[in-house]
Regions:
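N-terminal nucleotide-binding beta1-loop-alpha1 segment
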Residues: 11-16
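Active-site-adjacent betaalpha module
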Residues: 1-10, 37-41, 48-49, 66-196
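Short acidic, Gly/Ser-rich segments with clustered Asp/Glu that frequently serve as metal-coordination loops
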Residues: 17-23
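Von Willebrand factor
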Residues: 46-61
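Active-site loop signature of alpha/beta-hydrolase-fold enzymes
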Residues: 19, 61, 148
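Short glycine-enriched, charge-decorated loop/helix-capping segments at active-site entrances
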Residues: 25-32, 64-67, 156-158
Length: 196
């Protein structure tokens, strides 16, 4: 079944944190350098139209991680930082649904559709998307507002970030979510939304 935008979709901004600038820690090169710019467009649309959104923040338990709470990298990227009063959900695992009240907040507002963007495609974006799909939400991932990093396989083979990104998205498409670009999503949002 193809997902359709329903009601008031919630935007989940996953881990747009400064620590991801330390690319070597995450495997080296990253794809989609325009991901943050596209995320800004989407956040601006959600703010302007008073649609629900949540800033999701990763709090690493490892002092070595750039996302450890006492490091500068824990902070949100300047261009995507929450404004006063905007909801921020903090957790220490990959899924935005674990050890947060995200599901309760979505359900309390009658939200059945989520749009996932953020870092990184292969970890927290993928895990959050899979769980959203399993929980029964109509789920969308925005391919050019997410990004992946180079990876080393179990056999030592190196996989570049774009390949990691595309393979991850292909495992999500149709099974857990519908994958769209920023432009495709905005085009759909600018027509009457089903159920509104």
């Amino acid at each position: 079944m193809e997902n359709v935008l329903q009601g008031r979709p919630a935007l989940l901004l996953v881990d747009f944190q400064q620590g991801f600038e330390e690319k070597e820690y995450y495997g080296g090169e990253r794809n989609n350098p325009q991901a943050e710019q596209n995320a800004q467009k989407l956040l601006a649309y959600w703010r302007a139209n008073e649609l629900p959104f949540f800033h999701i923040q990763y709090s690493s338990v490892s002092p070595k991680s750039p996302l450890f709470p006492e490091k500068a990298g824990y902070a949100f990227k300047e261009e995507l930082k929450p404004l006063p009063g905007e909801p921020v959900l903090v957790r220490s695992v990959n899924s935005a649904f674990i050890n947060t009240d995200l599901q309760a907040q979505l359900d309390a507002q009658g939200i059945n559709t989520v749009v996932v963007i953020g870092l990184s495609t292969e970890h927290c974006v993928s895990t959050t998307t899979r769980m959203a799909g399993n929980l029964g939400y109509y789920t969308f991932v925005i391919s050019d507002a997410t990004a992946a990093f180079n990876k080393t396989g179990v056999n030592g083979e190196r996989f570049d970030a774009e390949l990691v990104h595309q393979v991850t998205l292909s495992t999500l498409q149709d099974e857990f979510a519908t994958v769209l670009t920023t432009q495709q999503l905005l085009q759909q949002l600018r027509v009457p939304v089903a159920g509104s």
